[in-house]
């Protein structure tokens, strides 16, 4: 029996997820500096027409409950001077085969010189677009655009499982010598989503607080070793 296509639950448009620019900088004097490259699960701007009236990771109940802030809460226990930046790259997801064009508006993020780059995206790339290019190769180029040869990397697969894209994310992680974190099972679990909290079905299909915490917990299982490698360089 074929598995349900959970990705179809994501009816939140990939376009116009932000009102401002796609780069949200961190402190330049922070150590370690952690860059999250993501999509609406990482950060979605206010969009009242779908009942999303806040600006943080969809669909957490508060900013401090999204996976970025839960991850950083864990990191800062060991590294009080740590800080993070975010690049919201829903644009790249829909244009991954076009090279650096979607990345250039966020070049400031690589100038921040992150110690660690976390790649946590892919859900907005329609499977039918995979024929347009080598997705795994494009993911490697995306990561290295921001981190170059100096950063260490962590890659997750997708919240809503997709075999082809999840395999590409896994292969990209291998090429980058990155830590790989599986979260694709979470998108199959109703309790990990925000059902009943939002009228818009696409928003509600995003991870709720429990899902966000679980994503953060899984990242934090591997992130300390990644940070240690980065700071040892």
Where are these regions (language model features)?
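Active-site segments of SGNH/GDSL-like serine hydrolases
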Residues: 118-127, 143-171, 175
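Soluble non-cytosolic domains of exported or imported proteins
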Residues: 58-66, 129-137, 159-164, 205-213
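Short hydrophobic segments within beta-strands
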Residues: 37-38, 156
């Amino acid at each position: 029996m074929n598995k349900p296509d959970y990705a179809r639950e994501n009816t939140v448009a990939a376009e116009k997820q932000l009102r401002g620019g796609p780069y949200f900088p961190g402190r330049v004097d922070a150590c370690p500096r952690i860059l999250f490259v993501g999509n609406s699960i990482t950060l979605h701007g206010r969009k009242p027409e779908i009942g999303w009236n806040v600006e943080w990771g969809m669909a957490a109940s508060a900013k401090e409950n999204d996976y970025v802030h839960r991850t950083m809460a864990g990191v800062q226990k060991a590294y009080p001077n740590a800080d993070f930046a975010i690049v919201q790259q829903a644009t790249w997801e829909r244009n991954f085969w076009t090279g650096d064009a979607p990345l250039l508006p966020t070049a400031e993020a690589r100038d921040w010189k992150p110690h660690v780059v976390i790649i946590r995206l892919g859900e907005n790339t329609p499977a039918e677009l995979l024929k347009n290019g080598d997705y795994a190769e494009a993911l490697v180029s995306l990561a290295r655009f921001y981190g170059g040869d100096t950063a260490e990397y962590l890659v997750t697969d997708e919240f809503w499982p997709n075999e082809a894209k999840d395999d590409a994310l896994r292969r990209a992680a291998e090429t980058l010598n990155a830590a790989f974190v599986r979260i694709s099972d979470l998108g199959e679990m109703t309790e990990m989503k925000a059902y009943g909290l939002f009228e818009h079905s696409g928003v509600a299909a995003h991870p709720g607080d429990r899902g966000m915490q679980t994503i953060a917990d899984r990242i934090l299982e591997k992130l300390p070793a990644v940070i240690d490698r980065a700071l040892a360089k």
